[in-house]
């Protein structure tokens, strides 16, 4: 093999979330590999409905292109971030637990330098979650800590308005996906009336064509998008979301989806590139800046990981020290 053509990518579908992930996934992956070898090109249009496959091949192509330039195969999109000159602020993640467990985790995240925490809600009794949030806000004010919550579609359309009103007492920055996807009338109403800004996440899965994306943004008008390349169209599909959201004045942040350091490296570099180029070139001048904090800390969950990348978190900021 010619080492100069070396490229590294990652396909990391998620069970129950990636619509293309089924018993035939690996067979399809091998078929795409053969087509790419024969044609020596990547047919992105043919892979629109297979975002994790598209993401893997896109990152491998970008990696090979970097190798051909004589650069590290990990420098996919040259930016100040990928050159180690700047970092990307990221949120910490705290799961629901007892008050003592959550307070200890919050204190640990603050000591580590995080100033934005995402809390998963909807897994335990809602009244208990409210009690825990009330206690936590007594310890950590909005000036100390930005709180984002992620409901993962836990609320019904009927109960969601009242629950959002209760949550709004705690200075919540935003709530991700309060109700399950594909309930557009209810979601549009929540986006109009919720006292907490709404960020769409699972709602974007399976919405892969530009016309569909345009319609979703026009009809739902969310306050934010949460973009995950493995789930939301690969690199190219995510860039489409970014351009459209910028034109609609809807800020986004980018989140990894349990990829290893190979995928996380690509997602982080896309995040930095998009902030430099895509948002700046497409957003109206009167639209707010992108949220500074992204969700790129999931590599910490691995016991063993790809070690050639040197993605390091310092004081709540992700740095690329690979070079």
Regions from the language model: what does each represent?
Residues 99-101, 123-139, 155-159, 179-193, ...:
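Active-site-adjacent beta->alpha loops and helix N-cap segments on the catalytic face
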Residues 9, 75, 147-149, 176-177, ...:
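General beta-strand structural signal in soluble alpha/beta enzymes
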Residues 257-323:
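Flexible C-terminal active-site loop/helix
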Residues 220-225, 231, 237-247, 251-253, ...:
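Active-site capping/gating regions of soluble enzymes
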Residues 63-67, 243, 269-272:
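Short glycine/serine- and small hydrophobic-enriched flexible loop segments
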Residues 95, 117-126, 148-153, 170-183, ...:
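Catalytic beta/alpha-barrel core
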Residues 111-115, 139-143, 165-173, 191-198, ...:
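Glycine-enriched alpha-helix->loop->beta-strand junction motifs that scaffold or abut catalytic
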Residues 1-147, 152-154, 161, 165-168, ...:
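N-terminal capping/lid subdomain adjacent to the active-site entrance of alpha/beta enzymes
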